[in-house]
Swiss-Prot record:
Pfam families, per database record: F-box, FBA_3
Protein name as annotated: F-box protein At2g16450
NCBIfam families according to UniProt: F_box_assoc_1 (TIGR01640)
Signal peptide: none
Matching CDD domains: F-box_AtFBW1-like (cd22157)
SMART domains attached to this UniProt entry: FBOX
Alphabetical list of InterPro entries matching this protein: F-box-assoc_dom_typ3 (IPR013187), F-box-assoc_interact_dom (IPR017451), F-box-like_dom_sf (IPR036047), F-box_dom (IPR001810)
Length: 427
């Protein structure tokens, strides 16, 4: 009896479980295979499979040979689901190296800006923007290293930029906000379709920017402060911290008032804020008071093993009503001043990651389960020779591979000839 032939559906089912790099190799087999693997059906199937195995993405930044250079290395490791059921001691996960990212003759980020959130992530792509000198804003695929240089902008003093994704039109957009008292205009750029051009955009409230951005269901959120601009903000009553909400699709701004400095996260598809008892506004310390942030955190942020955390989840956007929760836990290796909030897993664990990686010390991520009020630490191994000295680490949760990202034509080769990007005036 002859064996039954393998159906194309079974082949696609098997291949949808492979890494994206492996799938891309099959494009070269024949035009028919390239057509099959480039079809919307297979891309959706692959994304569905990939979404069931999210990973932690690590962007490790190291000071380059020149004073301003910053060299990036991208790794990923399995994102553990319900790690508490496996062990009460330290677990171990191995990081997979993807790419060293330092395009020739291209300054992409001033090294000393790293502590002031100079990197963003959205649906498989990394956005790195420069804040000083002639640093270039760009978007890259952290798995392959393919990237696109965005048109540069003249900015007065320090500007801030954010990265978001519109799930309806499936478009990536970068938002650049100017310094509130300086010349120029805030702008937005759409990536993935048409020419790369910054378009002028207007925000009705002047505000200082106080946090990195988080994009949830097509809305980009970040923390702002109107304290210094109450006289020019018209009828808006607020004179303190607020959450700025930018709709990526409509490109309109709305605002949510909050009482104090906080950290923003995506909690199971809802906006949530985290309050630490001893949290500090690093922008206020550095830019207004001239205080060294690292030194302040070292000397003033609680170094005790007992941690207190408040989580507010936005239950009603229109009424601005919050569901409020408070937690306390103890762990001898978890120190507030050494970690940053990486995000929240699909099952609701809040993930914390060490902010720096040192070759002489273990590198940990921590999974906090609010329902159990318990913390599980996981040692990440595998950075190896990439980390020969203390480096800054940005960690992102829920990283999945998407074949649509691989097909973006504006992502060039790893080291294309450098073309000077267009500059925009400050008008």
């Amino acid at each position: 009896m002859n064996p039954s032939p393998i159906t194309i559906d079974l082949i696609l089912e098997i291949l949808s479980r492979l890494p994206a790099k492996s799938v891309r190799r099959f494009h070269c087999v024949s035009k028919r295979w390239a057509s099959i693997f480039g079809s919307p059906y297979f891309k959706e199937l692959f994304l569905t499979r990939s979404s069931t195995k999210p990973r932690l993405l690590f962007a490790i930044a190291e000071k380059g040979n020149k004073e301003k250079d910053c060299v990036w290395r991208f790794f990923s490791s399995p994102q553990l689901e319900n790690p508490y059921e496996k062990s009460s001691s330290t677990l171990v996960a191995t990081a997979e190296f993807h790419v060293r990212f330092s395009p020739d003759n291209l300054l992409i980020c001033h090294y000393y800006d790293l502590k002031y959130f100079s990197i963003g992530y959205a649906f498989g792509l990394i956005y790195i923007y420069g804040n000083r000198g002639r640093a270039r804003p760009l978007i890259c695929n952290p798995t392959t290293g393919r990237y696109a240089i965005l048109p540069n902008r003249y900015t007065y003093r320090k500007a801030f930029s954010f990265f978001g994704f519109d799930p309806i039109d499936k478009q990536y957009k970068a938002l650049s906000m100017v310094y509130p008292s300086g010349p120029g205009h805030s702008r937005v750029i759409t990536f993935g379709a048409g020419d790369l051009k910054w378009r002028r955009i207007k925000c009705s409230l002047r505000h200082d920017i106080k946090s990195e951005g988080v994009c949830i269901n097509g809305v980009l959120y970040y923390l702002g402060d109107t304290s210094d601009w109450s006289r020019v903000n018209g009828n808006h009553v607020t004179s303190g911290y607020m959450i700025v909400c930018f709709d990526v699709r409509s490109e309109k701004f709305t605002f949510i008032d909050v009482k104090r400095f906080c950290r923003l996260i995506n909690y199971k598809g809802k906006l949530a804020v985290i309050y630490w008892e001893d949290d500090v506004d690093i922008q206020e310390l550095y830019y207004k008071k001239g205080i060294d942030v690292e030194e302040y955190v070292e000397n003033n942020v609680n170094a005790d093993a007992t941690n207190e955390l408040c989580v507010w989840i936005l239950a009603d956007v229109e009424k601005q009503e919050w569901s409020k929760h408070a937690y306390t836990w103890t762990d001898e290796k978890f120190f507030r001043r050494l970690v940053s909030i990486a995000g929240v897993t699909a099952s609701g664990e809040i993930v914390f990651s060490m902010r720096k990686c040192n070759p002489k010390q273990p590198f940990y991520v921590f999974y906090f389960n609010p329902e159990r009020n318990s913390l599980q630490r996981v040692e990440i191994q595998g950075f190896g020779e990439a980390v020969t000295k203390s480096c800054d680490v940005c960690t992102f949760v829920n990283h999945v591979e998407d074949l649509n990202v691989y097909d973006l034509k504006q992502l060039k080769s790893v080291h294309p000839p450098l073309v000077e990007p267009e500059y925009y005036d400050s008008d």
